[in-house]
C-alpha cells in the first residue's frame, strides 16, 4: 500500500510542477513533466489502484494532462518551424485565435494527421537487428543490388547526381524460407543512417472507410520527413494483388494510393527506397509490379550455400563435424530452403539433449568445470552405453546440475534430423516462380 501512495504522490507532484512551469511559460519543461506524470498515473491505474472509482478519476486526469501535453507539443513544433517558412507580405491573411493563417495551409486536420502518424511510429525499427551481409549465405546478386540501392547513395551521394539515380523500388520474390525477410534485416542493420520502416498489412488496413489510404499517404510523408528512408513491406501481395471486379472498394483504394505515392505526379521520392517481399509475385497488380524497378528472384540455395548455412546455424555449438561432412549435408539437401535447413539444425541440436534424457548409464569424464571453464575437472558425467568401461547405472535425474557434460553434435545427429524433416517447397510453385523470373525478373 505504501508503494501505491508513493507512486501516486510522485505523479501528483509532477503534475502540479508541470502546471507551474506551464503557467510560467516554460513549455518545454512543462511538456516533459506532464509526460512523466501521466506515466506514473498509468502505472498506478494498471498495477496499484484499488476500485473502479479511483481508476476512473485517475484516467480522467490522465486524459486532461495528455490533451495539454499534445497542445504544448504542437505549439513547440510550430514555433520551431515558423522561421523556416517565410510568408510573402501580400499573402499574409488574417490570423485566427489559434495563431493559424486562415487562408494559408489548413491546420485543422493536423490532429488527424498526427494520430495517423503516431499509428505508424510503431513500424519504425529503432533497435537494429544484428544481421550482417556475411550472415546471409549466398544471394550475391541480391546483396549487390541492395548495396547499390541503399548503402552506396548514403556513403557516396556525389555518385548519384544528374541522370544517375539510385533504385526507388526493389521486389524480392522467391519460395518461402529463402531469406527475403532476412535480407531486409541485413539492410536494416547495415543502413545505419537510414530510417527503416517495417510494414505489414495490419499497419495500413483500417476498419474505418478512407483511413487505410490516409495511412499509406502518411507512411510516405513520414518517410520523406525522415529520409534517407527504407520502407520494407513483407508479403506485399496481401496489399497489392491484381485489381478485379470482385475486390472491395477499400482494397482498390489502398492500391491506388500506393501507386500514386510510389510514382505519382508531384511526388518527390528522392532518398526513399520501397522494398517489397512476396512468395507469390504473379498475383501482384501489373502497375504495382512496374513500380518495382528491380525484381530479384531469391532462389532455393545451391549446395555450397546450403553447406554454409549448416555451418552458420551451428555457430559456436560444440560439434564433431568436418568440412567434408558439411559438404555432404549440402549435397543431401537439394530442394531444401534456408528455413528448412534452420529447422534441421535446431532438431539436430536437440539430439544430445534427447540422448541425456534416454540414457540409462553415465560415465565419468574430464572436462571444463561449469563454475570456471579454465579449470579442468575429472568428475563430469556424460551418457554412455551399458557396456562402456566405467559405466554407472543412473538416469539424468540422478546427475547433479553442474556435473553434466552433454555429448557434442555429430554427423549422425544431423542425418537423423534430416531424415525426419521434409522440404516445404513444392515443384509446382518453383515452376511458377521460374516462369515469372523469365518474364519479369532477374536472378538473385
UniProtKB/Swiss-Prot annotation:
Membrane topology listed for this record: Peripheral membrane protein
Catalytically driven reaction(s): ATP + H2O = ADP + phosphate + H(+)
Keywords attached to this entry: ATP-binding, Cell cycle, Cell division, Coiled coil, Endosome, Hydrolase, Membrane, Nucleotide-binding, Phosphoprotein, Protein transport, Transport
Entry-linked SMART domains: AAA (SM00382), MIT (SM00745)
Coiled coil: 19-82
CDD domains, sorted: MIT_VPS4, RecA-like_VPS4
Enzyme class: hydrolase
Record's keyword annotation contains Transferase: no
Residue stretches making up the MIT domain: 4-82
Family under the similarity heading: Belongs to the AAA ATPase family.
Subcellular location field: Late endosome membrane
One Pfam entry name: AAA_lid_3
This enzyme's EC code(s): 3.6.4.6
Domain statement: The MIT domain serves as an adapter for ESCRT-III proteins. It forms an asymmetric three-helix bundle that binds amphipathic MIM (MIT interacting motif) helices along the groove between MIT helices 2 and 3 present in a subset of ESCRT-III proteins thus establishing the canonical MIM-MIT interaction. In an extended conformation along the groove between helices 1 and 3, also binds to a type-2 MIT interacting motif (MIM2).
PANTHER family: AAA DOMAIN-CONTAINING, VACUOLAR PROTEIN SORTING-ASSOCIATED PROTEIN 4B
Job description of the protein: Involved in late steps of the endosomal multivesicular bodies (MVB) pathway. Recognizes membrane-associated ESCRT-III assemblies and catalyzes their disassembly, possibly in combination with membrane fission. Redistributes the ESCRT-III components to the cytoplasm for further rounds of MVB sorting. MVBs contain intraluminal vesicles (ILVs) that are generated by invagination and scission from the limiting membrane of the endosome and mostly are delivered to lysosomes enabling degradation of membrane proteins, such as stimulated growth factor receptors, lysosomal enzymes and lipids.
UniProt source species: Mus musculus (Mouse)
Family matches, as PROSITE patterns: AAA
Basic and acidic residues composition bias: residue spans: 86-101
Residue positions binding ATP: 174-181
Residue span of region Disordered: 77-118
Tissue: High level expression seen in the kidney. It is also expressed in the heart, brain, spleen, lung, liver, skeletal muscle, and testis.
One Gene Ontology MF term: protein homodimerization activity
Protein name, as recorded: Vacuolar protein sorting-associated protein 4B
Protein's GO biological process: angiogenesis; autophagosome maturation; autophagy; canonical Wnt signaling pathway; central nervous system development; cholesterol transport; endosomal transport; endosome organization
One GO cellular component, as annotated: ATPase complex
Amino acid at each position: 500500500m505504501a508503494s501505491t501512495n508513493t507512486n501516486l504522490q510522485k505523479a501528483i507532484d509532477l503534475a502540479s510542477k508541470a502546471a507551474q512551469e506551464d503557467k510560467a511559460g516554460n513549455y518545454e519543461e512543462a511538456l516533459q513533466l506532464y509526460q512523466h506524470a501521466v506515466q506514473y498515473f498509468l502505472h498506478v491505474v494498471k498495477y496499484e489502484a484499488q476500485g473502479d472509482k479511483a481508476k476512473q478519476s485517475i484516467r480522467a486526469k490522465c486524459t486532461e494532462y495528455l490533451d495539454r501535453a499534445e497542445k504544448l507539443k504542437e505549439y513547440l513544433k510550430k514555433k520551431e518551424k515558423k522561421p523556416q517558412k517565410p510568408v510573402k507580405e501580400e499573402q499574409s491573411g488574417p490570423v485566427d485565435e489559434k495563431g493559424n493563417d486562415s487562408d494559408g495551409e489548413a491546420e485543422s486536420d493536423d490532429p488527424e494527421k498526427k494520430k495517423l502518424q503516431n499509428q505508424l511510429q510503431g513500424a519504425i525499427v529503432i533497435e537494429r537487428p544484428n544481421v550482417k551481409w556475411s550472415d546471409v549465405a549466398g544471394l550475391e546478386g541480391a546483396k549487390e543490388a541492395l548495396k547499390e540501392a541503399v548503402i552506396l547513395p548514403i556513403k557516396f551521394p556525389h555518385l548519384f547526381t544528374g541522370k544517375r539515380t539510385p533504385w526507388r523500388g526493389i521486389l524480392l520474390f522467391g519460395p518461402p524460407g529463402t531469406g527475403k525477410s532476412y535480407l531486409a534485416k541485413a539492410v536494416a542493420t547495415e543502413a545505419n543512417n537510414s530510417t527503416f520502416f517495417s510494414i505489414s498489412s495490419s499497419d495500413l488496413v483500417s476498419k474505418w472507410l478512407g483511413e487505410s489510404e490516409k495511412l499509406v499517404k502518411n507512411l510516405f510523408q513520414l518517410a520523406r520527413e525522415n529520409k534517407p528512408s527504407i520502407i520494407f513491406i513483407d508479403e506485399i501481395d496481401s496489399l497489392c494483388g491484381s485489381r478485379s471486379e470482385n475486390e472491395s472498394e477499400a482494397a482498390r483504394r489502398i492500391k491506388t494510393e500506393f501507386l500514386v505515392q510510389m510514382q505519382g505526379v508531384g511526388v518527390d521520392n528522392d532518398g526513399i527506397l520501397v522494398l517489397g517481399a512476396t512468395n507469390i509475385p504473379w498475383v501482384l497488380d501489373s502497375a504495382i509490379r512496374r513500380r518495382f524497378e528491380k525484381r530479384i528472384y531469391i532462389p532455393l540455395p545451391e549446395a555450397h550455400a546450403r553447406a554454409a548455412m549448416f555451418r552458420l546455424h551451428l555457430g559456436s555449438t560444440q560439434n564433431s563435424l568436418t568440412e567434408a561432412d558439411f559438404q555432404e549435408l549440402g549435397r543431401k539437401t537439394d530442394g531444401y530452403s534456408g528455413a528448412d535447413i534452420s529447422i534441421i539444425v535446431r532438431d539436430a541440436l536437440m539430439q544430445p539433449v534427447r540422448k541425456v534424457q534416454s540414457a540409462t548409464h553415465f560415465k565419468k569424464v574430464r572436462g571444463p568445470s561449469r563454475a570456471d571453464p579454465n579449470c579442468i575437472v575429472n568428475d563430469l558425467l556424460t551418457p554412455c552405453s551399458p557396456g562402456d568401461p566405467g559405466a554407472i547405472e543412473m538416469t539424468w535425474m540422478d546427475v547433479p546440475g553442474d556435473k553434466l557434460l552433454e555429448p557434442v553434435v555429430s554427423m549422425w545427429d544431423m542425418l537423423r534430423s534430416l531424415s525426419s524433416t521434409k522440404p516445404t517447397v513444392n515443384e509446382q510453385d518453383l515452376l511458377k516462380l521460374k516462369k515469372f523470373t523469365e518474364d519479369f525478373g532477374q536472378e538473385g
